[in-house]
Amino acid sequence: RKRRGMYDEIVDRLNRISQFAPSTGVERGRRVLRNCGNPEKDLKIIHVAGTNGKGSTCAYIAQILQSNGYKTGLFTSPHLVDIRERIKINGQMISKSDFEEAYNAVENCRTHELAYFDYMLVMAMYYFKKQNVDYVVMETGLGGRLDATNAIENPVISVITTISLEHAAILGDTVEKIAAEKAGIIKLGIPVVCSGVVKEAARVIKSRAEEMESDCCVVDENTFELVQNTYGYIDFLIHNEYYKNDCFRLATNALYQMENASI
């Protein structure tokens, strides 16, 4: 019978850890990142929050960066089959040996109880720094303001996708309240790109951006225009200060992906 390796034991250990822990995720995240030498401070991070489309938007951003020659880290959740799907560089999952090393690094420097997501976040930052990536695309777990990813204080840009009612017991029972939680990722003077399709949410996000003296680029239904929806793909135009009726093609028939790709 094959002996179980250290990697399998670590995954079992992580799977037994609570999804939640005392104090808020952002407080725990700050503390453990500090204890681990703040690896995130050397990284160029694109921080993505939202209710709908944040996974797709992260994938588009990462692929665009990678296609332009940048070594790109991608941190997402949840995973479908393999826990290592959450931590990728240029589309490749972290190796089992690097996963072990990252876990041990976090375990050796933590001084308090962590939730499952905290481990994954700090392991990702450790690995991305060690691999010297050019950019990191980072998806929030739940919400924004109190999410562990919000311990990252120096993103290069914040991104907020479409907002709708979700996790009402935790984040709020109106679109505006949920938008306020998501807008909590906006940092002083750091630009933000957000969806403007849900007007009530966009108002809250723009207001927060003004308070934080952050330039805010809003992507709404006037930004993109369907040209054709044919078997297997969509052609659409983008109109903004960067593109004047430039045509793009997506290998999907899901029309909502026009908005995610435009963001």
Language-model features: locations:
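Acidic, Mg2+-coordinating active-site environments of NTP-dependent enzymes
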Residues: R3, D134-E139, P155-F248, A261
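Short functional linear segments
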Residues: R1-G50, T57, Q63-N68, F75, ...
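ATP-dependent carboxylate-amine ligase catalytic core
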Residues: V26, R30-R34, N38-K41, S67-E153, ...
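Short glycine/threonine-rich catalytic loop with a Thr-x-Gly-x-Asp
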Residues: T72, T252-I263
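A generic structural signal for residues located within well-ordered alpha-helices
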Residues: T24, S56, F117-M120, E181, ...
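Aromatic/hydrophobic pocket-lining residues that form π-stacking "cages" and hydrophobic walls in ligand
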Residues: I61, A124, I205
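A short glycine/serine-rich beta->alpha loop
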Residues: C109-E113, R249-L255
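Conserved G/P- and acidic residue-centered "switch" motifs that form tight phosphate/ATP-binding loops
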Residues: T51, G55, T161, S262
